[in-house]
Amino acid sequence: YGVRTTVLEKETYPYHEYPFLHQTGIFNVTLKDKVWGKSVNIICAFEADNGLKFSISIFRRKRDEKYAPGSSAIDFALEPLGTKFICTFVKTTSGFYKMSDAEYLI
């Protein structure tokens, strides 16, 4: 599924090209890369239709063990690179940014 898993693969994740997101909004995005995080999360790199490149961490839900935002059925651990989505990003009460919803862009 294109997830970087080995130490060497993780070291080559393009953090400099895809900095963590620091804004809210709804974006049409393409999944460009992904790597397992240090917790029960996957870090996904996206490129928005407007050219914005960013990463966001998606944590595993306890109820179904999917790496999915909110009530979305999309498990980003299983999605192939190049897949397009409409995603909503919000700022949490603790000041972090997260994906709150995702749908396939058709």
What are these regions (language model features)?
Residues Y1-I106:
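Short beta-rich binding modules
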